[in-house]
Amino acid sequence: MRTREKSYEDYGLTKEEIHYIKEFCFNSNTEQQKEIIKVALSELSPYIASKCLESLIHNKSYDDLCKEEYLYIGKDDFYGYRRKGMAAVKRWMIWNHIWEM
């Protein structure tokens, strides 16, 4: 299955977990939290990782990012990789004993 076609459920993420990950990323105020997000997203290509990082930390949608600059990735692909990145953030949170769900 292509990354763009995978859903949150395919990554084993529930609605509560999605909300928890988004809140963790948006409220990441320590260097440790930001480093966990960066390392987790490093599983993606550097360009996609940087855009997913900006999206998660600043709570920006694909359209918000497109208003600032042209994105070299389609909307479906962007959100597919963002979901994959969120699953990676969850894994890194578990490995670093930060996951509290």
Language-model regions, residue ranges each:
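N-terminal interaction/assembly modules
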Residues: 1-43, 63, 70, 91-101
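Short acidic alpha-helix initiation/capping motifs at coil-to-helix transition points
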Residues: 29-33, 56-58, 78
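Short, well-structured alpha-helical interface segments that form or flank functional binding sites
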Residues: 32, 47, 73, 77-80, ...
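Short amphipathic alpha helix immediately N-terminal
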Residues: 43-62
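Helix-turn-helix DNA-binding module
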Residues: 58-76
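DNA major-groove recognition helices of helix-turn-helix
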Residues: 78-96
